Amino acid sequence: MSALRIMVVDDFYPDPWSVRRYALSLRYRDAANENENTYYKGMLTTPQHPYAEIGLGLIASALNKPILWRAPIGEFRLLLTTDSDANLRDRATWIHYDALVARYAALVYLNPESQCVGGTSFYRHRIFNWNAIPDPHSQEMANLCRNLNIDIQGVLDTLKDDGFAIDEKWDLLTNVPMRFNRCIIFDSRQFHARMGTFGRTALDGRLTQNFFFDIL
């Protein structure tokens, strides 16, 4: 698999404190379904707000390329820690890819420096020796299925199940630390996971803005 494809843009928003204040003024909802609650976690705002389009415009400028999004995107995500997280699996991060949504992803960290913990990590699956999911119809996928005597659905199910087994199934390739007003833009086929959950309220919880898009 080829080298990681990550762009880091610091000082992303010209006035990040205004973005943070706006994000904290919005209403957050719990995950819409059990699957999202189990794997992605956190509370979301609507993507229908001014900073969604502003953020997408800044991403296009950073890439110096036009971009396309197929659905409203750019919501804020708030992730908190609670004493009620009794199950370790409920607290754990989950290694995954987002290629089914769009080819590229971006997130903006909106916590002040004094709160910044962890970041976003990228991994290689040990058994498959992949750092990203290949095209289902690629020769690479066909070779793996033949060598391991499994079908494509078996590959996808394995990746999903292994997502919580970080120490046993994955090798860490790199970590992009959280920093206030830092934007990470990356190929969403790459295996990645958030690192660090903190805070009990909106004022000190992990706050990000999330985007999925394609490049024209």
Regions found by a protein language model. Name each.
Residues 1-185, 189-216:
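Fe(II)/2-oxoglutarate oxygenase catalytic core
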